[in-house]
A protein has these predicted regions:
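Second-shell loop/turn segments in exported
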Residues: 7-11, 84-92, 102, 164-170
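Active-site neighborhood of glycoside hydrolase catalytic domains
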Residues: 97-100, 104-116, 121-122, 126-175
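Active-site-adjacent "subsite" loops/lids of carbohydrate-active enzymes
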Residues: 33-108, 156
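Anion (oxyanion) recognition and catalysis
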Residues: 19-26
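Short, well-ordered coil/turn segments that N-cap beta-strands
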Residues: 26-32, 109-111
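Solvent-exposed loop/turn segments at secondary-structure junctions
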Residues: 1, 38-42, 119-122
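Aromatic-lined carbohydrate-binding/catalytic grooves of carbohydrate-active enzymes
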Residues: 1-15
């Protein structure tokens, strides 16, 4: 928010924002914490502001984005309009990517690292239903899911009924 309106500010690659905050805090006798939007891969901004984050700048692969079980079928969160785009926590490449970021953060002299949004997508129980999650879930339960994802949740279902099936319990445990 600059001069009464939105303005996209370009960041420079050679300025270390975290170190600048750590230094300023230490000068005032304050401890610093690093916080990361852990499973967030980016944001598609409204109002023509564009997009930001590793899913948009090429750092992350599009296949890393969570897949949502919508009423119209399975959709990548990248194809669902504006808003926050989550990474799939079950994807090994995502985990390795995030561990690299955490390793970088751990090199700073901070009191701690806060893992915000270290969870599945904002779409209630509707994510992640990617092929990666299917394979990992089937390994977890030791059998194939015949009707994916309908054996767990019907298209667009975003809450649990009074009766929770064994497959739903297994899915929630897996997640």
């Amino acid at each position: 928010w600059v001069t009464g309106g939105y303005k996209w500010l370009q960041r420079t690659a050679d300025f270390d924002y975290l170190q600048a905050f750590i230094d300023a805090g230490k000068a005032e006798g304050l401890d610093g914490y690093a916080a990361i939007n852990t499973m967030v891969g980016g944001k598609e901004c409204p109002y023509g502001l564009g997009s930001d984050g590793p899913l948009f700048d090429g750092t992350a692969k599009r296949e890393w984005a969570s897949v949502v079980n919508t009423s119209e079928g399975l959709k990548s969160c990248m194809d669902m309009g504006t808003g926050t785009k989550f990474l799939n926590p079950a994807n090994d490449e995502v985990v390795e990517y995030l561990l690299g970021i955490l390793e970088d953060l751990a090199a700073y002299d901070v009191k701690g690292i806060i893992l915000d949004r270290c969870r599945y997508d904002d779409n209630d129980l509707q994510s992640d239903f990617s092929e990666v999650s299917r394979q990992k879930f089937e390994e977890f339960i030791g059998k194939k899911v015949e009707n994916w994802p309908d054996d767990i949740f019907s298209p667009g279902q975003n809450s649990l009924d009074n009766y929770v099936t064994a497959m739903q319990r297994d899915w929630m445990t897996f997640r």
